[in-house]
């Protein structure tokens, strides 16, 4: 370093107070020669002082350079300081490294336009030469080396453009006539001349596996997702090394997830699955009932419009019975699938518990943990049994509701058929017909089979009479066999009486009106008797009753 008392570099002068110079009075008797001698001596002294100062400064500079060689390198030190500032300030670096966005594209476009302009000029010169028709062919043509070089560059550019166009035509699918290019790429990849693309079948399969794991409701929660992703990545690496080990890695991942899962999450999953299944079942039954109602309404409409063709009605009834049978088969198969699904879940969970016990034995865990697991298993099995009981109750209740709906629909259809028959008979009956009761009786006896409309009316009346008798009291009620014989006799007696009385149209009953207790059949035996009466009335011949 420099001497501590010395100061090197840029030294700013300090402000000093001006000295009061003492002016010497010139002597009156002085000579000019004295003045000249004084001025010479002063100049010599001044020069000597300057030389002394120069010598002193040189010595000081030499000493400073000997101590530190970079004392007077002001420019290099300043440049280093500026570089440090730029390095510390990232904005300045970003400003320097930033490249223009559009100028390089503009420059390329300018070059392309220049080449096109040169081509146009060449074509123009060529046309002028053709117009001259060989007038100046004998003259000597002066061609510079720069022009020759330009012509060579132009020829190379044209050759490059032709090659690029041919390659594009070869790779373009719309310009290819066959699959030769595709097969050529396949061959090159098989031989090894071309690199196989990254998106291979193996990577696509791993992506599909990951999506499958995300889709199911019995997966782990979002807390266990990172562990699952790590296991997936390790499984993918093992699959790449050994392609046959995909299934093994999947099974190990599933085992780890199941082992880490807690009993609480299991219960939540079971409740979620049960609620989802209930919603699905409700939607299924609702859609089925709505479709059945729609089918029944259309069926009844067609039946009322086509009431004249009784054979057509019989065919529709058979179709309806076949559809009901199909729906019953579908419901039975659906219930069987549900029960099998529940049994499968229970067996899967039992297998899960057994596997846990089998893993705990070789690890040598304590007896307390095994007892806790057995207690949890018993609790879980009791919960499963309760859930199965609830499912069975729900299925039984839905079957009862369905049967009740079918019975009500059957009764509505029968009542509408009766009304349609009465309207049809009223329409067909001629106005002012004074036919006697004897003619009616003769026609009835001569006809091979009774009219189905009359039979339906008789059936309705008999059911009403039976209900009224039942309401009166069961104390003086005769046995059921006697009542059935009495109702048969009454029906046979009412038939001839019906011909004598003028028929009155039945009152139109609204479909949505509430039925009274007289119209409802109370017991299974009454329903059986009603069916027997309907069968007897529908027969084409009259059976002789055995007294």
UniProtKB/Swiss-Prot annotation:
One Pfam family this chain carries?
NRP1_C
Question: How is the quaternary structure described?
Answer: Interacts (via C-terminus) with SRSF1. Interacts (via C-terminus) with SRSF2.
Gene Ontology MF terms in the entry: mRNA binding
Q: Which UniProt keywords apply?
A: Acetylation, Coiled coil, Isopeptide bond, mRNA processing, mRNA splicing, Nucleus, Phosphoprotein, RNA-binding, Ubl conjugation
Cross-link (Glycyl lysine isopeptide (Lys-Gly) (interchain with G-Cter in SUMO2)) at which positions? 198, 209, 279
Protein's organism: Rattus norvegicus (Rat)
What is this protein's name? Nuclear speckle splicing regulatory protein 1
What are the GO BP annotations of this UniProt entry?
A: developmental process; in utero embryonic development; mRNA processing; regulation of alternative mRNA splicing, via spliceosome; RNA splicing
Which cellular components does GO assign to this protein? nuclear speck; nucleus; ribonucleoprotein complex
Residue spans with biased composition (Basic residues)? Answer: 277-287, 340-355
Where is there biased composition of kind Basic and acidic residues?
200-217, 255-269, 308-339, 356-480, 490-506
- Which gene is annotated as encoding this protein in its UniProt record? Nsrp1
Q: Which residues carry this modification: Phosphoserine?
A: 27, 33, 247, 252, 447
N6-acetyllysine modified-residue sites: 276
């Amino acid at each position: 370093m420099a001497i501590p008392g010395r100061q090197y570099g840029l030294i700013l002068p300090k402000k000093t107070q001006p000295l009061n110079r003492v002016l010497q009075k010139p002597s009156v008797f002085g000579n000019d020669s004295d003045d000249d001698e004084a001025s010479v001596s002063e100049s010599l002294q001044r020069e000597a002082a300057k030389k002394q100062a120069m010598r002193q400064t040189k010595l000081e500079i030499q000493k400073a350079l000997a101590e530190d060689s970079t004392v007077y390198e002001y420019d290099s030190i300043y440049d280093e300081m500026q570089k440090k500032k730029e390095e510390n300030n990232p904005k300045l670096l970003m400003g320097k490294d930033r490249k223009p966005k559009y100028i390089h594209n503009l420059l390329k476009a300018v070059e392309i336009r220049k080449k096109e302009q040169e081509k146009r000029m060449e074509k123009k010169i060529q046309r002028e030469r053709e117009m001259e028709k060989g007038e100046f062919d004998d003259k000597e043509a002066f061609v510079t080396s720069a022009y020759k070089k330009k012509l060579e560059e132009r020829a190379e550019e044209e050759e490059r453009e032709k090659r690029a166009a041919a390659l594009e035509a070869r790779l373009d699918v719309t310009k290819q006539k066959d699959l030769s290019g595709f097969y050529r790429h396949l061959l090159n990849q098989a031989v090894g001349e071309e690199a196989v693309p990254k998106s291979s079948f193996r990577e696509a399969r791993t992506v599909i596996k990951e999506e499958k794991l995300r889709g199911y409701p019995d997966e782990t929660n979002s807390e266990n997702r990172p562990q699952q992703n790590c296991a997936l990545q390790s499984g993918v690496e093992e699959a790449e090394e050994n392609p046959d080990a995909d299934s093994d890695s999947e099974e190990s991942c599933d085992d780890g997830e199941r082992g880490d899962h807690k009993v609480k999450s299991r219960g939540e999953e079971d409740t979620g699955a049960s609620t989802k299944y209930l919603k699905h079942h409700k939607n299924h039954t609702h859609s089925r009932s709505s479709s059945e109602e729609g089918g029944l309404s259309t069926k009844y409409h067609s039946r009322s419009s086509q009431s004249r063709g009784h054979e057509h009605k019989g065919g529709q009834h058979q179709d309806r019975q076949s559809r009901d049978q199909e729906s019953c088969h579908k419901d039975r198969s659906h219930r069987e699938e549900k029960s099998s699904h529940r049994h499968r879940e229970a067996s899967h969970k039992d297998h899960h518990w057994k596997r846990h016990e089998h893993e705990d034995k070789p690890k040598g865990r304590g007896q307390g943990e095994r007892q806790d697991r057995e207690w949890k298993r018993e609790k879980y099995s009791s919960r499963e049994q309760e859930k199965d009981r609830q499912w069975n109750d729900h299925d039984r209740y839905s079957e009862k509701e369905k049967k009740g709906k079918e019975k009500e629909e059957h009764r509505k259809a029968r009542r509408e058929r009766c009304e349609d028959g009465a309207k049809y008979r009223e329409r067909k009956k001629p106005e002012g017909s004074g036919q006697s009761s004897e003619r009616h009786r003769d026609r009835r006896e001569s006809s091979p089979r009774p009219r189905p409309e009359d039979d339906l009316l008789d059936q309705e009346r008999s059911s009403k009479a039976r209900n009224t008798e039942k309401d009166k009291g069961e104390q003086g009620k005769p046995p059921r066999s006697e009542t059935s014989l009495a109702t048969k006799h009454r029906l046979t007696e009412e038939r001839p009486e019906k011909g004598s009385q003028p028929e009155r149209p039945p009152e139109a009953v609204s479909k949505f009106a509430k039925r009274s207790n007289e119209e409802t059949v109370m017991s299974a035996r009454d329903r059986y008797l009603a069916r027997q009466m309907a069968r007897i009335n529908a027969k084409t011949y009259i059976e002789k009753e055995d007294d």
